[in-house]
Regions:
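Extracytoplasmic substrate-binding proteins
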Residues: 76, 176-243, 339-356
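C-terminal motif of bacterial Sec signal peptides marking the signal peptidase cleavage site
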Residues: 27-31
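Proline-aspartate-enriched helix->loop->beta-strand connector
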Residues: 157-163, 182, 290-293
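A short, structured surface patch at a secondary-structure boundary
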Residues: 102-152, 166
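Bacterial Sec-exported substrate-binding components of ABC uptake systems
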Residues: 2-21, 32-106, 209-237, 302-305, ...
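Structured C-terminal subdomain patch of bacterial secreted/periplasmic proteins
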Residues: 291-356
């Protein structure tokens, strides 16, 4: 009897255990279904965010995509190759993650974005001297005899080439370079440094860095403009460039001329009121209406012409000379193209004119 009871007891235990297992299995299956639905919904939301990033640069919840890339639910990068059109109309496939960029004469802007090129522009053995500390270890490519051959460029293994002027792309060079790596061409990057920095930042996934750099420069220029205005007023400022081939008065549309006359709002001579530059000679010099003059000995190669002009009685009789308001500009960066150079120029102008 006791044995039969024990057998019955064990039988009930087996039945109860089986029932419990069924309940547990059903619960687990239900939970897994909920988890799958939840993960699918989360994946859909993340996919929507990534699409928003690719098309607008921002995610749907209002958070900015700093480098115009997204992340999936595992936190890995979702960068993808994209196609853009350069300023000459070429369709250019930009790599998902640019590692090795070659952008001769745009080293200033590259460094401002925190990017080192695989090689740098040089005239003979001299690159942009004011950038050499930051470009330490970056090989020089001599452009004095023309652009580097495709074979020479291939040795640096660039995955993106950026040409700062359309003249660099002429005579079949673009077609040759484009076979090495995707090649983006500006019409004239130096003509609008702010615009070209913005584009370069976008190409390299550094859009937010470019935006911050531009805001910082605008703030610096605005503060300098206020200081200069109280001293200079409506007087004119001139930039005279001495070079082996001649002497010229720089206008306000590019390089240091843009900084002085556009960013700092300083008046310019009527000789360059509508021109990018004007030739200067001893005969024309008396027409120069400027109370402040900055002198540039271009790459230290205009010494002979500088001496010829500045030792003449006509020069010595000019108001700016008599008043001690002629300043020698640093030719390393006054002919530079980029915010690093522009910031240095702003500092020079404020220090020279205001003494601050």
């Amino acid at each position: 009897m006791a044995e039969r009871f024990n057998r019955g007891k064990r039988s009930w235990r087996i039945k109860i255990s089986a029932l419990a297992c069924c309940v547990i299995v059903i619960g687990l299956l239900s939970g897994c279904g909920d988890k799958v639905d939840s993960e699918a919904a989360g994946g859909d939301q993340q996919a929507a965010k990534n699409v928003a990033i690719e098309t607008t640069g921002t995610v749907e919840d209002g958070q900015e995509s700093t480098e115009e890339t997204g992340t999936n639910s595992e936190g890995t990068s979702t960068k993808e190759e994209r196609t853009v059109t350069d300023e000459l109309g070429h369709e250019v496939k930009i790599p998902a993650d640019v590692k090795n960029v070659f952008a001769p004469n745009m080293e200033d802007s590259l460094l401002k974005l925190g990017v080192k090129p695989v090689a740098q522009w040089a005239n003979g053995k001299m690159g942009h001297t004011y950038l050499q500390q930051e470009l330490d270890g970056v090989p020089l490519i001599d452009f004095s005899g023309g652009l580097p051959s495709p074979e020479a460029l291939m040795s640096f293994e660039p995955d993106l080439i950026v040409l700062h002027t359309e003249t660099y792309a002429a005579d079949g060079t673009y077609e040759k370079y484009a076979k090495i790596a995707p090649t983006y061409v500006f019409k004239n990057a130096s003509g609008n440094v702010e615009k070209s920095l913005t584009i370069l930042g976008d190409l390299l996934g550094k859009a937010s860095v470019a935006e911050t750099a531009l805001k910082d420069y605008e703030q610096k220029a605005s503060e300098a403009k206020a200081k200069l205005s109280s001293v200079v007023g409506d007087k004119n400022v001139a930039i005279i460039r001495f070079a082996p081939r001649g002497v010229s008065l720089m206008g306000g549309n590019y390089l240091c001329g843009f900084v002085l006359h556009q960013d700092l709002g300083l008046g310019k001579s009527k000789l360059v009121e509508k021109e990018n530059a004007a030739n200067i000679s001893l005969e024309i010099l008396p027409q120069l209406d400027a109370d402040y003059i900055f002198v540039i000995n271009a790459y230290d190669q205009g010494t002979e012409r500088l001496k010829e002009i500045t030792e003449s009685p006509i020069w010595k009789g000019m108001p700016a000379v008599k008043n001690g308001q002629v300043y020698e500009a640093n030719n390393e960066y006054w002919l530079g193209s980029g915010l690093i150079a522009y910031e240095k120029i702003v500092d020079d102008v404020v220090r020279s004119i205001t003494g601050q």
